[in-house]
Amino acid sequence: MKFFDREKEIAEILHILNREPDDVYFIYGPINSGKTALINEIINNRLDKDKYVVFYFDLREIFISKYDDFIEVLFEEYEGNKKPVEIIKSLIKDVPSLCGIPAPKNTLEEILKKKTTKNVFRYITKVLMDIKKEGKQPILIIDELQKIGDMKINGFLIYELFNYFVSLTKHKHLCHVFCLSSDSLFIERVYNEAMLDGRAKYLLVDDFDKETALKFMDFLAKENNISLTNEDKELIYNYVGGKPKDIKYVVEESNFKDLKEVLDYLLNDEISKLDMFLEILDYSKPRVEVGNEVIEINKEDIIKALRLFKDKYEIPKKDIPTPVYVYLVKENILFLNPQKRILKPQSYLVWNAIKRLL
């Protein structure tokens, strides 16, 4: 399928890339809002391949629990006497981005043996500087960064990474750094992190607004040779809102199924999930960590919080006690925008399930 819209976000990211690196950028948004698709569109179709070298690390693809896993994500081993920059130059002729930084076998063995991030970062910096000397601008993109949020290597790895990213951008102006995440609690933690104050920027990739969602339906209908009336499009939006993945599923399924049947199937599925979530709370009391305290959550407090969404899609964060919204965000029922300090359901389907069930 052709890429649709996001021209505003694309223009902003290209504008950032045309400047000297100076900030770490965090790209966040609800689940399935199109963050990865946006970045892939930029990497594959919008960048001058003669000007940029992109390293794209997708952490969702690898289970990371120890130092060796982290190294496996970052590096691609090779044998021979070629310099890493020569390997990179030969690779980027054929692919738009690299999924690891080339490292000679003996160098990689040494990095694995010493088990310190200092050696890792020193090697990466050397490679990035060599790329810069070749007249190209390196870009690091880390997708689902929160996967290493609690991992420790001589202290929390994430803080060492933040310091390193700040060094690459704010201090050395060497490399653009973009971190993607759909974990809004992680983004809230990052947003309030003192070491990143004045050194990081945040880009929200949200679900489509109504106008764009309706245009997306027209686009998909044309792509799939489907006829959608205005009433059909309004019905789709009322059920799934502007969630690109949900809209795509509904339009494509409606090619050979009744539209209302497809929509009711999705909604009933979401209602069943929410019902089960609430039923489990009759038998267990979840706990969440807030600061240095572990707080127990009551079912009554969760229901009270969810009922606030009966008549509103968005509410101020302060309207729900912190432990309760933390739990609901962890369970992917709510999404938190830390910049605007608002909470909303992860999707229109979740919102409709809340309204039907409560």
UniProtKB/Swiss-Prot annotation:
CDD domains the record matches: AAA (cd00009)
Keyword S-adenosyl-L-methionine annotated: no
Residues that coordinate or bind ATP: 29-36
Keyword Lyase: no
SMART domains registered for this protein in UniProt: AAA
UniProt entry keywords in alphabetical sequence: ATP-binding, Nucleotide-binding
GO molecular function: ATP binding; ATP hydrolysis activity
Domain of life per record: Archaea
Gene3D superfamilies with a match to the protein in the record: P-loop containing nucleotide triphosphate hydrolases, Winged helix-like DNA-binding domain superfamily/Winged helix DNA-binding domain
A Pfam family reported for this protein in Swiss-Prot or TrEMBL: MJ1010-like_2nd
Homology family: Belongs to the archaeal ATPase family.
Record's protein name: Uncharacterized ATP-binding protein MJ0074
Lineage start: Archaea, Methanobacteriati, Methanobacteriota, Methanomada group, Methanococci
